Amino acid sequence: MSDKKWNPELALAAGLLSGEVTSAQVIEARESIQATDFADLRCQAVWRMIEGMVDDGIDINATTVIRHASKTKLEKHTGPIGPFIVECGEPAAPFQCLEDILDASKRRRLLAAGAELIAAGKDTGKL
């Protein structure tokens, strides 16, 4: 995997699972990492939520992130966060499996964009 480009989604998930992502690191990283740096919409939502948790003084780890996602109803829009974090952060997963996860993420984004276009067309009566 060393010849592949750095993937922020996998890094965030792996960091949450390993306990390497802490509140202090999030505060430090805010200057260089934006939600839009993540290609996956779920990661964007999770990163924004994590920033809010840090602002509220909540410790950051996989458990608190998953619980907070459930409390704030984030999962209603993103789907289950726990399985997503585990899938993305599984260090023993073969690289092909990780690529498949990312491909599935791209498909979800395309479907979501298509649904938005269809909805916009219905709103304007052009469909």
Task: Write out the residue ranges for each language-model feature.
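Noncatalytic partner-interaction/assembly domains of nucleic-acid and motor enzyme complexes
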Residues: 1-106
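Short amphipathic helix-turn segment from helical bundle oligomerization domains
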Residues: 84-88, 117-122
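Acidic/polar active-site rim loop that often engages polyanionic ligands
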Residues: 92-95, 111-118
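Non-catalytic interaction/clamp surfaces of large macromolecular machines
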Residues: 112, 120-127
